[in-house]
């Protein structure tokens, strides 16, 4: 299992929807019935042996993403990509091959290597190595450059665009009274659950706006490729994310461009995998060069490279859209920081805007599978929608506590670690999505805001996945 992503290891399923009770590919092992049981032991090399029957070595099971087509458990994607294509081993292989091609001047096969860093992994690595957040981003640039990266970017511009698209989508739906409650779509674990468990019921309510990762894929494979005059297929785009499900999101066929013969994101590695790479290199992050992140989008660099979006920890969707809708629909300018009211637990919160004693906006944040289940049941029971918008994330505490974030190393409780990361996030500068750069991208590359082109590349669609089970097996996880 060392060759595979840790997404298949049961110890790392914190960020996944609770696994389905039925596996679509239980491996059948033919064996004679025995009156006595057998013990299985794990050898030093990781192999399994049936120890009381002559030390019989057991065969390793290989599972691809396609095998897990209809599973809503640890692997949740319908794409036909082996999981080894989303591993640090595959990344190192590509980087080594590219380095050899450069050395031999085989320019036809040299690829431009682009890394994109999400905010949450930067925070996780900054805390792990006890360095400042901006310095952590700069050290990561130095590290990835040492591996052969040509560009190292942040998701800041994609985060901004995602909020601009999502807020406009909400206002349009609200004014047309269509498909409300609107549900956020940036969490791939939640989207996969919606597709495979509640299909036709939930999907009309899910926002069509792409996640920042996939918007970044468009920016890199189309806009940056045009700037460099390089075909998209000659760019290898790697993202660093806080959650394993982002690997599966990148593997969706919806995010493969037939015109460019290329995926928007070729490989996803996670915070914990970066930590493993640094451990294997036997050199802490702080010992790599301090290099500013690249900013190929305009001539003017922002003052900072790592930004927060509102107070909430998963992109700021609920807070930002609530403020925008209040101002543009009800002429209420909410300049103060919003306070969400905690309901049954800290991962289910809501906020209400009233005018003349009437509730005109009601938003919620639902993190974690328990709250997602409660939300879905609530939506099913109500004939008239109770919420206008819900920010939904599969992980308790949201993306800051993604299952691929670095775990505590000194006996520290995960909640304490999450609180420390929250403090780092709250101290980041706040980004205002409607800025000169996003306007420049819309006007110069996307034919303007709300154009047909911008909708085509910044929005996606979802699929009602129907499971046809040939074998049923109950599993207790």
From Swiss-Prot:
GO molecular function annotations of the record: 4 iron, 4 sulfur cluster binding; metal ion binding
GO cellular component terms given for this protein: cytosolic [4Fe-4S] assembly targeting complex
UniProt binding sites for [4Fe-4S] cluster 1: 23, 68, 71, 74
Binding residues for [4Fe-4S] cluster 2: 187, 243, 395, 399
Keywords in alphabetical order: 4Fe-4S, Iron, Iron-sulfur, Metal-binding
Family as reported in the entry's similarity comment: Belongs to the NARF family.
Cross-referenced PANTHER family: NITRATE, FORMATE, IRON DEHYDROGENASE
Function per UniProt: Component of the cytosolic iron-sulfur (Fe/S) protein assembly machinery. Required for maturation of extramitochondrial Fe/S proteins.
Name of the molecule in the record: Probable cytosolic Fe-S cluster assembly factor CG17683
Organism encoding this protein: Drosophila melanogaster (Fruit fly)
